[in-house]
Curated annotation (Swiss-Prot):
HAMAP family: SecA. GO terms for cellular component: cell envelope Sec protein transport complex; cytosol; plasma membrane-derived thylakoid membrane. Its EC number is 7.4.2.8. It is found in: Cell inner membrane; Cellular thylakoid membrane; Cytoplasm. One of its GO terms (molecular function) is ATP binding. This is Protein translocase subunit SecA.
């Protein structure tokens, strides 16, 4: 009703930006006639206009028109009006909700080009290394054509490579890399080690995934601490002995476990201790983690075991997260449960949440297919508005009603039947599952029925082929099982993706002959021992060694290449080998060559031209098959998407649905659910249990009931609220840490950049003297009762150079005079100390100042992080005492922070006065001065 009275706020917003689009379209004809050189020249012209005082908004229409034309010339893609609209919204610091297949990647080129003109740098943030690389290679061509530099950050890069890439006008990087680089920069010991520039503007692709789904997980850089590994093993054995409901309760909702009195008694008896919480020999932490590992962390759901290591599986994307570990000893507990080597436990050195990381950008925009459901959260936490961009073509997707089964087994059998029917009809099917285990169970069912299918989950052998599998998921009768949103970012094109197939064929011939051998195992694939090496991948084979093969599965290709096309391809590769050298390029550079060859960008490189001719010929041959198949699949109803469980957020369900019906194609979606699914079991409560009893139906008969659907939606809303509250709590607590983090990092950066830190150290010393005076002198007592002896002793403790000072020198002075006298003495002592040190090596004192300040900041900040963690644990319990834990955390956290700052000052003063370097001819780096 309100909408009718006030009008749709989204429509009002779109209307506000419409004049920009009209102006861009009017400029199109003028821009079209420019030569390539003139089009490139526009970049310098825009920079001059900005230097003369024009704003980015002033040049927006012309800049966007230039990017549109560059996109048409380089990629053969012209931005639609709705994509232009998306670009304007991103530039204005909002979230653009754009449906799958509407070309979000292309939209990002508009605001990133415009904002890069200021020279302050733009980050385009994606969810994984593969997408960052793909976008930098693909969309980066538009920017490179227009004269801007494009950087790419990959997890395997060295600090100097990172520095170079962050210096570029536009840098493509994943959310985790940008976060870890930020933390590492704030642990650097010299400015030369800092890799990032100050943040300016970023565009986040899949913004919901990064700012909502990952917001509960902080980024942590940690160092190792020694803990006895046998405790983990013993605790794992205890956990196996203890029984659920008798010895402990499991709270699946809060993902926590609580020991009962019987449980405590049993555990203490088995361990032969009297108290699990004994500070001298603590066991509680180990036992709780072991039970969590047993009950809440399941193999092939939350993690997989690979090469004797426990590797986390991302619950939202189904991808593995190598290198990431659960903290607080939980990862070690799981390692003990799985009987693999237990890695040392870690201590947090630096941490930040994605929420606070991205709030460091003065301006940010984001794109996703699904943001409206989380609009309130985006506005409250990030002050980001969500604007829905209309689709370019009318949507023809049909969302069928849910089918609910009583038992899980009935649901899976029905899904297998539906896959078989669709396969028979020649319609492609995409099945989204929530875990590796479930995807493999369905795969087993389909195998039994003899239905050919592709499996895409976190198992390493499948991850390698991710883009390849998704690119062919639209072929006639294809059945693809994928965990969650694996394959996000790769479009499912009906009839198959001829461009991608041609690119695979090009890689197959080109890569083995051009990639440097030592580069091969960077992204290596484990091959079975004894197999011959793949196509051209060097002679001989070392069993168990990782060897890279670029050979795609033969069934991917719709047809054999003609003799002429194959000849053309071989000649192009031979020519490349002659020009570049045999197996001479790093893998990333070779990938880049393939990417450029597969696009339309003008090039002077004769190798690229030859490779491009071969690529175009192959694509043309494949297209004859895929275009016929496309029409056939469209005629049969397009892609059918099956959801196998409702997720904890409607948004993730919508992402899965969004794979079907892209760009006006037909398609359909249906969710198959059972009353045993986690969502209904954990959050549906007694109501669902009652319904289970009431429905006296067969296990494989679907139930359709309005009451059930309402229960389901209610459960989903409950989960969304529950997780939103957790994220809000994480944010509020981290907000306290954030203010402290910013203060300490700003202080640290001042020290790193500061040329002369002498004044700062003297201020530290004066402040320390003031604190000593205030501690030993009680102004309410007569001066003869002041503890001047103790005061002087304490001063000498800090500054041994003042050993001649006597208490009687201070007897006739007031408090402010004593302070002024000590300030003067400290200055003299510091000059003396500096002269002593600089005799050993000129300028050594300056290095020592920087070294000691940074060292004390880092050590005490590390200890402070642990104190804050402990404080957070303890204030949680005060909630029972009618106190607000957050207020307690803020006030006590502030006290701890002030104590830390005082200790930094005192430690630096003490360390510098006590510093006695050994005379030596040369001191190479400040870190050798210990």
């Amino acid at each position: 009703m309100l909408k009718l009275l006030l009008g749709d706020p989204n429509a009002r917003k779109l209307k506000k930006y419409q004049p920009y689009i009209t102006e861009i379209n009017l400029l199109e004809e003028d821009i079209k006639v420019l030569s390539d050189e003139d089009l490139k020249g526009k970049t310098a012209e825009f920079k001059q206009r900005l230097a003369k005082g024009e704003t980015l908004d002033d040049i927006l229409p012309e800049a966007f028109a230039v990017v549109r034309e560059a996109g048409r010339r380089v990629l053969g893609l012209r931005h639609f009006d709705v994509q232009m609209l998306g670009g304007v919204i991103l530039h204005s610091g909002q979230i653009a909700e754009m449906k799958t297949g509407e070309g979000k990647t292309l939209v990002a080129t508009l605001p990133s080009y415009l904002n890069a003109l200021t020279g302050k740098g733009v980050h385009v943030i994606t969810v994984n290394d593969y997408l960052a690389r793909r976008d930098a290679e693909w969309m980066g061509q538009v920017h490179r054509f227009l004269g801007l530099s494009v950087g790419l950050i990959q997890s395997s890069m060295t600090p100097s490579e990172r520095q170079k890439n962050y210096e570029c006008d536009i840098t493509y990087v994943t959310n985790s890399e940008v976060g870890f680089d930020y933390l590492r920069d704030n642990m650097a010991t010299s400015m030369a080690d800092v890799v990032q520039r100050p943040f300016n503007y970023c565009v986040i692709d899949e913004v919901d995934s990064i700012l909502v789904d990952e917001a509960r997980t902080p980024l942590i850089i940690s160092g190792q601490v020694e803990r006895p590994t046998e405790k983990y093993v013993q605790a794992a054995e205890i956990a196996l002995t203890l029984q659920k409901d008798e010895h402990y309760d499991v709270d699946e909702k809060a993902r926590n476990v609580l020991l009962t009195d019987e449980g405590f008694a049993q555990a203490e008896e088995l361990l032969g201790v009297t108290d699990l919480f004994d500070p001298e020999d603590p066991w509680a932490h180990f036992v709780f983690n072991a039970i969590k590992a047993k009950e809440l962390f399941l193999k092939d759901v939350n993690y997989i075991v690979r090469n004797g290591e426990v590797v986390i599986v991302d619950e939202f994307t189904g991808r593995v997260l190598p290198g990431r570990r659960w903290s607080d000893g939980l990862h070690q507990a799981i390692e003990a449960k799985e009987h693999v080597d237990i890695q040392p436990e870690t201590q947090t050195l630096a941490t930040i949440t994605y929420q606070n990381l991205f709030l460091l950008y003065p301006k940010l925009g984001g794109m996703t297919g699904t943001a409206k459901t989380e609009e309130a959260e985006f506005e409250r936490i990030y002050k980001l508005e969500v604007t829905i961009i209309p689709t370019n073509r009318i949507r023809r997707r049909e969302d069928l009603s849910d089918l609910v089964f009583k038992k899980e087994i009935g649901k899976w059998q029905a899904i297998a039947r539906e896959c078989a029917e669709m396969h028979e009809l020649g319609r492609p099917v995409l099945v989204g599952t929530t875990s590796v285990e479930k995807s493999e169970y369905l795969s087993q069912l389909l195998r039994e029925q003899g239905i050919p299918h592709e499996l895409l989950n976190a198992r390493p052998e499948n991850v390698e082929r991710e883009a390849e599998i998704v690119a062919q998921a639209g072929r006639r009768g294809a059945v693809t099982i994928a965990t969650n949103m694996a394959g996000r970012g790769t479009d499912i094109i009906l009839g198959g993706n001829s461009e991608y197939m041609a690119r695979l064929k090009l890689r197959e011939y080109f890569m083995p002959r051009i990639v440097r051998p030592d580069d091969e195992d960077v992204f290596g694939v484990q091959r079975a021992a004894g197999l011959p090496t793949g196509h051209g991948a060097g002679q001989g084979f070392v069993p168990g060694k990782k060897v890279k093969t670029w050979k795609a599965s033969p069934e991917i290709f719709p047809t054999q290449l003609s003799k002429e096309a194959e000849q053309l391809l071989k000649e192009a590769v031979d020519f490349a080998v002659r020009e570049y050298g045999d197996r001479s390029l790093p893998e990333l550079e070779a990938e880049d060559k393939v990417a450029v060859a597969a696009e339309k960008a003008p090039t002077d490189d004769s190798v690229i031209q030859k490779l491009r001719d071969a690529y175009n010929r192959i694509k043309h041959e494949y297209e004859e098959f895929t275009s016929t198949e496309h029409d056939e699949v469209v005629g049969r109803g397009g892609l059918h998407v099956i959801g196998t469980e409702r997720h904890e957020s409607r948004r993730i369900d919508n992402q899965l649905r969004g794979r079907a019906g892209r760009q006006g194609d037909p398609g359909s979606t249906r969710f198959f659910l059972s009353l045993e699914d986690n969502l209904l079991r954990i959050f549906g409560g007694d109501r669902v249990a009652g319904l289970m009893e009431a429905f006296n139906v067969e296990d494989d008969m679907p139930i359709e009931s309005g009451m059930l659907t309402r229960s389901l939606e209610g459960a989903q809303r409950k989960v969304e609220t529950y997780y939103y509250d957790i994220r809000k709590q994480v944010f509020e607590y981290d907000e306290v840490m954030n203010n402290q983090r910013r203060a300490i990092y700003a202080e640290r950066r001042r020290v790193l950049e500061g040329q002369d830190l002498k004044e700062q150290v003297i201020k530290y010393a004066e402040k320390t003297m003031d604190e000593i005076v205030d501690y030993y002198i009680n102004v309410d007592l007569p001066s003869e009762e002041w503890e001047l002896d103790k005061l002087v002793d304490k001063v000498k403790e800090f500054v041994y150079l003042l050993s001649d000072m006597q208490a009687n020198q201070l007897e006739d002075m007031g408090v402010s005079e004593i302070k002024a006298f000590l300030h003067e003495q400290v200055r003299i002592a510091y000059d003396l100390k500096e002269a002593q040190i600089d005799q050993i090596q000129p300028g050594l004192m300056r290095q020592a100042e920087r070294f000691f300040i940074l060292q004390r900041i880092d050590t005490l900040w590390r200890e402070h992080l642990q104190q804050m963690d402990a404080l957070r644990e303890s204030v949680g319990l005060r909630g029972y005492g009618q106190k607000d834990p957050l207020i307690e955390y803020k006030s006590e956290g502030y006290e701890l922070f002030l104590d830390m700052m005082v200790n930094i000052r005192r430690d630096v003063v003490y360390s510098l006065f006590m510093f006695q370097p050994q005379p030596q001819p040369v001191v190479q780096t400040s870190s050798e001065m210990v």
